[in-house]
Amino acid sequence: MAAVAGLYGLGEDRQHRKKQQQQQQHQKEQLEQKEEQKKIAERKLQLREQQLQRNSLDGYGSLPKLSSQDEEGGAGHGFGGGPQHFEPIPHDHDFCERVVINVSGLRFETQLRTLNQFPDTLLGDPARRLRYFDPLRNEYFFDRSRPSFDAILYYYQSGGRLRRPVNVPLDVFSEEIKFYELGDQAINKFREDEGFIKEEERPLPDNEKQRKVWLLFEYPESSQAARVVAIISVFVILLSIVIFCLETLPEFKHYKVFNTTTNGTKIEEDEVPDITDPFFLIETLCIIWFTFELTVRFLACPNKLNFCRDVMNVIDIIAIIPYFITLATVVAEEEDTLNLPKAPVSPQDKSSNQAMSLAILRVIRLVRVFRIFKLSRHSKGLQILGRTLKASMRELGLLIFFLFIGVVLFSSAVYFAEAGSENSFFKSIPDAFWWAVVTMTTVGYGDMTPVGVWGKIVGSLCAIAGVLTIALPVPVIVSNFNYFYHRETDQEEMQSQNFNHVTSCPYLPGTLGQHMKKSSLSESSSDMMDLDDGVESTPGLTETHPGRSAVAPFLGAQQQQQQPVASSLSMSIDKQLQHPLQQLTQTQLYQQQQQQQQQQQNGFKQQQQQTQQQLQQQQSHTINASAAAATSGSGSSGLTMRHNNALAVSIETDV
């Protein structure tokens, strides 16, 4: 029985050897096919280099692209049996070689001279676009937006005209412009075409302390402290406006009594506030903050002349000046109350002086209302409104001009139409201007109305003309407002959101061979782990089992071979990345990949030879064990021999 079992085990061993030989033959055929493909690709690159050399020597354009038969069959033969020569075709332009660009699977073809028009861009610079070159497919690959590349390629073909496709969002196209490195000039031109007005660059102070103070008061978004300062400024502005309105209430007014005659008195409002007045004290606190803010901003500004020319700073100055004039008036009245000798003044001069001073004080108090425009520094809505009015000055001028023509025309018409009526409200043409303005703006107070039939007809025509006149320029003003509003919101969204698009995976030097090495290395290591798990989980296979001792050297050899391969891979990657990409041509890149793949094949062959030697030693050991088992007649040893043979064959198959 033992001899039969040994013969049965040898038969299985032969079958496994046969399968192993078939697998090795299949692997050898695959390697030969890969080598043929590499030779063909290398031949293509050599032909392309020869074409470029001929072009540089002869001064002509590039050669026409070879046919597939010429590329695959090497150097073709002409009709006479000799080698066929490709003569360059004369051109008027250089760089007529066609370039294939693959954008997410969509292939584009263009001429090299088209891309070379913009050498500072990604596609125009040979060193930069070489990172994305695939030598096996002989094309450049970009994993980017396909619809956007139509406009990018048209930018090169048209000589610098950039047009965004309708189906591409604005943010996506902006990212594509940045990726292809078209430059700041192209980006600014694109933003102008899309309606984004280029904002003027606001310089910062050179001194570090001045820069911090300037950012603190001028840019509320720069820090948390700047936001606090902005909130305080807004609160003080609102408080001053509320005080300005509340002090005009009758219960808060101050009155003076004047003796006009012997038995007559006159009561008038006191235009000069008292120093102890609560409103005046609050106004003083607000002015202290406004003055402090304006002074600090002036001292920290980078350009004093531009600071004085700014409209917002002029408004700040106008909002402060009335207080100091009022304060000077209060101090002057306090001096008048003192019993000091004064020159006699006539009653007429005194009344005229009082009227003049009251008029000046009222104008000064009116100027305080301009403080409300200080809110525009902290309000995006007011800034948009100001930009809209500034951009619509022409339309507003046309509106006022049309209203002026209508007012003159219809006020004259209604005056002559109502001239014969006894109860007419229109005493003169200038007196009818008010009625024409109120009617054309469709307000209609009713204080002046036509009485006669002809006057009513003129009033009807005036109302219709006013509706048409006002309605014509209003849509243009509204469209300007929508434009500035959407532009502001789009800019805020682009600044607040970070668009994380899929970036291209460039073909860096050596990446083609490294991927194959890493995959083969991971597969071999996973196979070793599975083999080790299988050995440990095999029933009856203990540490003293002969199968364990036969497998252990093989696993140790594989682990020792894995470490130098991984270290050599990392060293080769580091060395290749240290070389400047500008000095690598397509031929050098491919030659490096060929050398790496050749080293991989040599290592694989050495590993295969070592494995075969180990298997031969294991087979001789198992044959000796089977012979010993046959002589002893032990059934258990025959079973052990079969188990060892099966284990050795499984090891050889996995390798």
From Swiss-Prot:
Disruption phenotype: Hypersensitivity to reactive oxygen species generated by the redox-cycling agent paraquat. Reduced sleep. Flies sleep for one-third of the wild-type amount. They perform normally in a number of tasks, have preserved sleep homeostasis, but are not impaired by sleep deprivation. They also have a reduced lifespan. Males are able to discriminate between males and females during courtship but their courtship of females is reduced, suggesting that their perception and/or response to wild-type female pheromones is decreased. Expressed in mushroom body (at protein level); this overlaps with expression of qvr/quiver/sleepless and nicotinic acetylcholine receptor (nAChRs) proteins also involved in sleep regulation. Expressed in the adult brain. Enriched in the mushroom body, anterior optic tubercle, superior protocerebrum, antennal nerve and visual projection neuron fibers projecting into the lobula plate of the optic lobe. GO terms for biological process: action potential; axon extension; behavioral response to ether; cellular response to dopamine; courtship behavior; detection of visible light; larval locomotory behavior; learning or memory. Residues 1-224, 301-311, 379-393, 486-655 are cytoplasmic. It is a multi-pass membrane protein. Changing residue 489 to A: In RNA edited version. Residues 519-528 have a biased composition (Low complexity). Glycans are attached at residues 259, 263. SUPFAM superfamilies: POZ domain, Voltage-gated potassium channels. Residues 1-87, 515-548 are annotated as: Disordered. GO terms for cellular component: membrane; membrane raft; neuron projection; perikaryon; voltage-gated potassium channel complex. Residues 1-188 are annotated as: Tetramerization domain. The transmembrane segment S4 functions as a voltage-sensor and is characterized by a series of positively charged amino acids at every third position. Channel opening and closing is effected by a conformation change that affects the position and orientation of the voltage-sensor paddle formed by S3 and S4 within the membrane. A transmembrane electric field that is positive inside would push the positively charged S4 segment outwards, thereby opening the pore, while a field that is negative inside would pull the S4 segment inwards and close the pore. Belongs to the potassium channel family. A (Shaker) (TC 1.A.1.2) subfamily. Shaker sub-subfamily. This is Potassium voltage-gated channel protein Shaker. It comes from Drosophila melanogaster (Fruit fly).
